[in-house]
């Protein structure tokens, strides 16, 4: 099967920017922390038949290494320190850390080991799963088909937005993890760069480098989840995560993710010092209008001008949804819109995969994500979910999944 031989992932930079940002912080602060992460398919699809092909790709990823050209690119950015980049240059992903099996048709994947290494598996592995599955299901889809579909979407957007001043509309490509394929991803970004003046950048470091785009991203749920076990007092864990991030990046990468333990619990921890230092907030679950109103009200209650802050929306967006949010908020606060699947897997007759890889353990103990959307809650340990809800004064209503 020659189609299995060619590697899908050919660069360590073919990942989301925040993975490298978080990895540097982990390297500096939590070098000896161990974690485990697991794959989840939120739908009812049986993907186990692809386990062998995915495992072949994982083995190929063990050959990846940072090139001198890539090292020089990262070194020229303001985020990275030389000690981290020197270590990253020596890093080789270890496929033995990734356990893959076909469990009666279900795809099971568990990644375990040092956090500083495990952290790099999630995004490229999800991209591999998506590309392998779509390669079998929709072999007729080409990058040209994707570009033509995007042109139709952009035409619709121009029509819908004809009456709006879009100078404050900022689109970010968040499409790596559930893209149809790398070739489709590249075609989408090429089209956006030439046809859409409101593209601010991409979360993908490889394409940012190759296409002279701005790389964008800060931190993910796993940063907050791991602190649930790193921090000695569970109730202080979210504040500890926020402070540790500021210690690593005091003057940059200042967008905070709010929904690891619900927006309400986040805002209780996000006092005037954090709100003043952080540039803004990212929405990833729950009602985006209600969330944005809470964020603006919180800034105002703290005496901070919302027009000095940024809201980043990234939950299941497409261009019409982003435009609706822009209409609602753009006179009151700065806005960016991270669109992923609806850019890089928006194709005729193709159903995108609803797949994630999330942290489930840190230092051998459970961690949880209690998002603002019940279906996105992740934890296998009901007792820990109960303890987390008690620590953050949340009602004991949502069942862990």
Swiss-Prot record:
GO molecular function: nicotinate phosphoribosyltransferase activity
Pathway given in the UniProt record: Cofactor biosynthesis; NAD(+) biosynthesis; nicotinate D-ribonucleotide from nicotinate: step 1/1
Catalysed reactions, semicolon-separated: nicotinate + 5-phospho-alpha-D-ribose 1-diphosphate + ATP + H2O = nicotinate beta-D-ribonucleotide + ADP + phosphate + diphosphate
Post-translational modification: Transiently phosphorylated on a His residue during the reaction cycle. Phosphorylation strongly increases the affinity for substrates and increases the rate of nicotinate D-ribonucleotide production. Dephosphorylation regenerates the low-affinity form of the enzyme, leading to product release.
Residue numbers bearing the Phosphohistidine modification: 221
Protein name as annotated: Nicotinate phosphoribosyltransferase
Classification via InterPro entries: N/Namide_PRibTrfase (IPR041525), NAPRTase_N (IPR040727), Nic_PRibTrfase (IPR006406), Nic_PRibTrfase-Fam (IPR007229), Nicotinate_pribotase-like_C (IPR036068)
GO cellular component, one term: cytosol
Class of the enzyme per the UniProt entry, highest EC level: ligase
Organism (species): Edwardsiella ictaluri (strain 93-146)
Gene symbol of the encoding locus: pncB
Protein function: Catalyzes the synthesis of beta-nicotinate D-ribonucleotide from nicotinate and 5-phospho-D-ribose 1-phosphate at the expense of ATP.
Pfam families noted in UniProt: NAPRTase, NAPRTase_N
Gene3D superfamilies: nicotinate phosphoribosyltransferase
EC number(s) from the headed UniProt entry: 6.3.4.21
Keywords, comma-separated and alphabetical: Ligase, Phosphoprotein, Pyridine nucleotide biosynthesis
GO biological process terms held by the UniProt record: NAD biosynthetic process via the salvage pathway
Domain of life: Bacteria
SUPFAM superfamilies: Nicotinate/Quinolinate PRTase C-terminal domain-like, Nicotinate/Quinolinate PRTase N-terminal domain-like
Membership in a protein family: Belongs to the NAPRTase family.
């Amino acid at each position: 099967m020659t189609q299995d031989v060619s590697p899908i992932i050919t660069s360590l930079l073919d990942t989301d920017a925040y993975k490298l940002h978080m990895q540097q912080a982990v390297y500096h602060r939590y070098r000896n922390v161990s974690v485990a992460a697991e794959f989840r398919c939120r739908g009812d699809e049986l993907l186990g038949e692809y386990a062998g092909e995915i495992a072949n790709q994982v083995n190929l990823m063990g050959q990846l290494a940072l090139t001198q050209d890539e090292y020089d690119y990262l070194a020229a950015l303001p985020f990275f320190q030389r000690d981290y980049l020197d270590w990253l240059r020596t890093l080789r992903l270890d496929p033995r850390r990734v356990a893959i099996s076909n469990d009666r048709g279900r795809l099971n994947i568990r990644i375990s080991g040092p956090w500083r290494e495990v952290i790099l598996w999630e995004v490229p592995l999800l991209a591999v799963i998506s590309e392998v599955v779509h390669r079998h299901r929709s072999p007729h889809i080409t990058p040209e088909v994707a570009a033509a579909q995007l042109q139709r979407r952009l035409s619709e957007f121009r029509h819908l937005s004809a009456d709006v001043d879009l100078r404050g509309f900022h689109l970010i490509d968040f499409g790596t993890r559930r893209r149809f394929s790398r070739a489709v991803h590249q075609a989408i970004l090429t089209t956006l760069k030439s046809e859409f003046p409101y593209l601010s950048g991409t979360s993908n470091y490889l394409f940012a480098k190759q296409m002279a785009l701005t790389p964008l991203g800060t931190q993910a749920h796993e940063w907050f989840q791991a602190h649930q076990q790193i921090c000695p007092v569970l109730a202080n864990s979210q504040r500890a995560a926020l402070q540790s991030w500021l210690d690593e990046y005091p003057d940059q990468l200042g967008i905070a993710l709010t929904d690891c333990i619900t927006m309400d619990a986040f805002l209780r921890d996000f006092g005037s010092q954090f709100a003043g230092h952080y540039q803004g907030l990212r929405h990833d679950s729950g009602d985006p209008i209600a969330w944005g109103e809470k964020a603006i009200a919180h800034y105002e209650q703290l005496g901070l001008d919302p027009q000095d802050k940024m809201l980043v929306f990234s939950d299941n967006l497409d261009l019409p949804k982003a435009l609706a949010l822009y209409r609602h908020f753009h006179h009151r606060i700065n806005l960016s819109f991270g669109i992923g699947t609806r850019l890089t897997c928006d194709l005729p007759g193709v159903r995108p995969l609803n797949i994630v890889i999330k942290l489930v353990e840190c230092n051998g103990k459970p961690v949880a994500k209690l998002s603002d959307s019940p279906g996105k809650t992740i934890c296998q340990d009901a007792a820990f979910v109960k303890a987390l809800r008690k620590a953050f004064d949340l009602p004991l209503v949502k069942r862990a999944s």
